[in-house]
């Protein structure tokens, strides 16, 4: 028998067939329930829709090994804890780069709404989160859309990215390894990540503890490329010693 939660999610799916996104307030009005009820529906269990930046969007599905819908429901509180720490690094009037990934929207959410800042991103989900910040000037880089991770891969970096030198770049990664460095699942993410590594003044890697010791197919770079590594808890001694040797600040 279909539960009320399943029925509501089914209605949201039908609505998202007509539109690429649905604001939380509009969804609540459509279903005749509170916004908190919808938040609970989407947070309690994995669902084919997800709430990002105040908008309900359909989870992108493809043959990729890395699906946002699969990752989003994992270690939510741990990601949120790391994200809150990372957000404390933001100061007024800075220009910031935000990577793709399921931790990044939590960083944006944790930034004080009174702080004015400029943001550069290449992920649809990241952009939707930035839209909710009242004093954010957001730039979404265009290019070829990849549904598996909801990013736009730029065709010409001269169009937008090369006009920026971010104060801070916030990166996500699916793997963190002492010798292999920071890695992710998708090769198409690398051009923008590498651009940020060459142009930003400060580099901050934000990962939950499950990423340590993992190696994924696409290599971002050595860990020593990052000034700060933020996580939800202290990593193993191997990483602590490496950070001390390379003068990388650990935040947890």
From Swiss-Prot:
DNA-binding region per Swiss-Prot/TrEMBL record: 22-41
Q: Does the keyword Transcription apply?
A: yes
Instruction: Tell me one GO molecular function of this protein.
Output: ligand-modulated transcription factor activity
Query: Which cysteines are disulphide-bonded?
Result: none
Kindly state a single biological-process term from the GO annotations of this entry: negative regulation of DNA-templated transcription initiation
Extract the SMART domains matched here.
DeoRC, HTH_DEOR
One family from Pfam that matches here is DeoRC
| Protein keywords | DNA-binding, Repressor, Transcription, Transcription regulation
- Which positions fall inside the HTH deoR-type domain? 5-57
Family annotation (NCBIfam families): PRK10681.1
Its quaternary organisation is: Homooctamer.
Task performed by this protein: This protein is one of the repressors that regulate the expression of deoCABD genes, which encode nucleotide and deoxy ribonucleotide catabolizing enzymes. It also negatively regulates the expression of nupG (a transport protein) and tsx (a pore-forming protein). The inducer is deoxyribose-5-phosphate.
Q: What is this protein called?
A: Deoxyribose operon repressor
- The encoding gene is deoR
């Amino acid at each position: 028998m279909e539960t009320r939660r399943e029925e509501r999610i089914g209605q949201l799916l039908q609505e998202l067939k007509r539109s690429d996104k649905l604001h939380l307030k509009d969804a609540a009005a459509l279903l005749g329930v509170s916004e908190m009820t919808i938040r609970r529906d989407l947070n309690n269990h994995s669902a084919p829709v997800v709430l990002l930046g105040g908008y309900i969007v359909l989870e992108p599905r493809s043959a990729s090994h890395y699906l946002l819908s699969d990752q989003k429901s994992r270690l939510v509180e741990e990601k949120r804890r790391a994200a809150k720490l990372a957000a404390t690094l933001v100061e007024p009037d800075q220009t910031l780069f935000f990577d793709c990934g399921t931790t990044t929207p939590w960083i944006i959410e944790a930034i004080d709404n009174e702080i004015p800042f400029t943001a550069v991103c290449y992920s649809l989900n990241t952009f939707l989160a930035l839209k909710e910040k009242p004093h954010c000037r957001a730039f979404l880089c265009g290019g070829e859309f990849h549904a598996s991770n909801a990013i736009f891969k730029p065709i010409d970096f001269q169009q937008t990215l090369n006009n920026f030198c971010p104060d801070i770049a916030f990166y996500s990664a699916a793997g963190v390894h002492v010798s292999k460095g920071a890695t992710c699942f998708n090769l198409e993410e690398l051009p923008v990540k590498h651009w940020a590594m060459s142009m930003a003044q400060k580099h901050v890697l934000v990962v939950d503890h499950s990423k340590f010791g993992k190696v994924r197919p696409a290599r971002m770079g050595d860990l020593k490329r990052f000034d700060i590594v933020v996580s939800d808890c202290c990593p193993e001694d191997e990483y602590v010693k490496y950070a001390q040797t390379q003068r990388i600040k650990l935040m947890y």
